[in-house]
Amino acid sequence: MSKFRVGAIVPVKTFLRAKTRLNLSEEKTEQICSIMLESVLSAISQSNVIERTVIVSKDESAFNMGKKFGAIQIYEQEELGVNNAVMLGDSYFVKEDFDLTIVFPQDIPLIQPEDVRMLFEMKGSNRCVLVVPSRKFDGTNALLRMPADVMETHYDEDSYKIHLNTAEKKNATSALILIPRIMLDVDDQADLRLILTRDLPVSKSLESVFKS
């Protein structure tokens, strides 16, 4: 485990309200969201970098999944978006005196433990922000912030550019980090079909649901 106290924040939208662009049945959507979340939590847990993981959600299925990995549960009364969810996670980790946090979405199923370690090891100064963008460079797929409260997040607003610009305004060093497996998130069926081409167990699990 790192000498730094590293926390992971995983905002989870209610499975049945998530991924509507997949155009799948509610049952299949819920199964796919569950498989993806399990893959993300597994990678975090096995990375030997993250001391504690927080799931912010109002979905009981997500919390039940989190229990398998010892995740802390923060219940959202209302789903007010990713930024609000991250803010709740921030409050927890600042109160617990963690040195840095990494925000991971629920929909990057290809992520591996070594990807988490790589991102952590790329941090520079003790005041830094690292952004892993989405494959389409239209969002932020992982966000490392040190210290944990160095800045608020700006998801859903051309976020990766804004995160880098905000870091500069906060006098934090920043960098865009390209980690292919983290960059591939699932928003629609084209993304999902791309995931299915990968020779990984999670791809097989997703395929069994998608093609059933």
Language model: regions and residue ranges:
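A short, N-terminal amphipathic alpha-helix
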Residues: 34-49
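Short phosphate-binding loop-to-helix
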Residues: 67-100
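Acidic donor-binding segment of Leloir-type glycosyltransferases
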Residues: 48-72
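Conserved alpha/beta core of the MobA/IspD/sugar-nucleotide pyrophosphorylase nucleotidyltransferase superfamily
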Residues: 2, 168-212
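Short, glycine-/small-residue-rich phosphate/pyrophosphate-handling segment
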Residues: 144-167
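The conserved acidic donor/metal-binding loop of glycosyltransferases
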Residues: 105-109
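Conserved donor-nucleotide/metal-binding helix-loop-beta segment in metal-dependent transferases, i.e.
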Residues: 111-137
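N-terminal nucleotide-binding beta1-loop-alpha1 segment
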Residues: 1-22
